[in-house]
């Protein structure tokens, strides 16, 4: 039975095209490693995916007047095209938008909660009464109410 190798690459936010630094800093080295181990007869699983729910996606969607889903879908498709063009050999390049990811995330959360590793707490957050939503930290600019930094974001 061949040795099993897992290569897990960091998931890029799907809010912009992958730049040369992303490609050469994580995806290409992972691919080189996977190819090496495959040549050595090892069973390799190289995985990654698009982070479709991060704050950068929401920020870009708001700035463009479109939904976060539209931003994610466009960039995820371009990621796949790029990897195919340069020959990156992912066994699975998925996203945080799949039903499987949702299921596994919920399972991890409920398992932690059921075993006493999570707790309920109250936290102050910025809220817009005009937009009727809470603001992520990247949307809040001005003087920090905690440290007094006048250029806080």
Predicted ranges, named:
Residues 1-153:
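N-terminal, positively charged nucleic-acid-binding surface of large information/translation enzymes
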């Amino acid at each position: 039975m061949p040795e099993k190798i897992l290569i897990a690459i960091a998931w890029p936010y799907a809010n912009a095209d992958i730049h040369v630094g992303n490609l050469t800093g994580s995806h290409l080295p992972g691919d080189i490693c996977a190819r090496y181990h495959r040549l050595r007869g090892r069973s390799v699983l190289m995985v990654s995916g698009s982070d479709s729910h991060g704050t950068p996606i929401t920020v870009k969607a708001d700035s463009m007047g479109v939904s976060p889903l539209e931003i994610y879908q466009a960039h995820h498709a371009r990621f796949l095209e790029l990897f195919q063009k340069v020959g990156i050999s992912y066994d699975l390049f998925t996203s945080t938008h799949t039903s499987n990811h949702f299921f596994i995330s919920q399972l991890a959360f409920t398992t932690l909660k059921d075993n006493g590793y999570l707790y309920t707490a109250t936290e102050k957050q910025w809220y817009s009464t005009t937009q009727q939503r809470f603001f992520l930290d990247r949307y809040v600019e001005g003087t920090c109410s905690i440290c007094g930094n006048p250029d806080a974001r």
